[in-house]
């Protein structure tokens, strides 16, 4: 990112602020909305994904820990559906790792094509007012597998994953359960970045 000029840094900061507002309100969607605009500024997703991953780690962990403390004191009910979360992770973890491997090894042009294609499909569902829903157990399995892979490749698998989680997790627990899921999936991605010696852009996290 050292080659960027001031106005590009300013645009990146504004996009990250916007994605943070979306994530804090919905619990998901910040990356999917921000990544296309970031790639217009610089087309290397490996630059932005470590920073986005760090934001997810900090935001999700602080939110869940705060709510967990309230639940422990009896002020609120437990906010994480651990049982379903564990079952979903067993399905998603291998596709997730395959997606991360693809992100690290595939050419940037191919990764960008995948990202823009997926976001284009998401956009079409919005324009056509079509809600992504999983109505059968087989569809649940496919959504979690594909969502896990997309999450590994680009962190934008949330719409597919949420379609499944919203069926089995109560509305009260959904947001925090998703935050724990993002935290675990992002830890896998960041660990892979470290192993692959990818620049985590630590100075730019500030």
Which residues make up each language-model segment?
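Membrane-interface helix termini and inter-helical loops of multi-pass transporters
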Residues: 1-3, 74, 100-110, 132, ...
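Membrane-helix interface segments
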Residues: 44-45, 110, 136-138, 170
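A generic helix-loop boundary/linker signal
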Residues: 4, 28, 51, 92, ...
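Residue-level signature of transmembrane alpha-helical entry/exit and packing/kink sites
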Residues: 8-12, 84, 88, 112, ...
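Alpha-helical multi-pass membrane helix bundles of inner-membrane/thylakoid proteins
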Residues: 115-117, 124-147
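Small-residue-rich hydrophobic segments that form or flank transmembrane alpha-helices
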Residues: 9-83, 143-152, 156-206
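Membrane-helix interfacial "entry" motifs
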Residues: 1-4, 8, 76-80, 84, ...
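Membrane helix-loop-helix hairpins that form the core translocation module of multi-pass transporters
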Residues: 46-127
């Amino acid at each position: 990112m050292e080659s960027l000029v001031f106005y590009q840094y300013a645009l990146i900061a504004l996009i990250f602020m916007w994605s943070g507002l979306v994530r804090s309100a919905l619990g998901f969607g910040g990356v999917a909305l921000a990544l296309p605009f970031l790639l217009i500024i610089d087309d290397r997703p490996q630059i932005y994904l470590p920073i986005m991953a760090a934001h997810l780690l900090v935001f999700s962990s602080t939110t869940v820990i705060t709510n967990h403390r309230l639940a422990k004191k009896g002020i609120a009910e437990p906010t994480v559906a651990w049982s379903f979360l564990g079952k979903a992770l067993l399905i998603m973890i291998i596709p997730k790792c395959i997606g991360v491997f693809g992100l690290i090894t595939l050419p940037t042009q191919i990764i960008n094509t995948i990202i823009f294609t997926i976001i284009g499909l998401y956009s079409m569902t919005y324009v056509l007012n079509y809600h992504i829903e999983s109505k059968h157990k087989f569809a649940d399995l496919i959504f979690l597998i594909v969502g896990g892979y997309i999450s590994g490749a680009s962190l934008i698998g949330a719409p597919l994953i949420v379609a499944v989680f919203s069926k089995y997790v109560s509305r009260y627990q959904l947001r925090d359960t998703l935050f724990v899921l993002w935290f675990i999936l992002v830890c896998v991605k960041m660990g892979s970045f470290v192993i692959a010696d990818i620049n985590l852009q630590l100075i730019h996290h500030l």
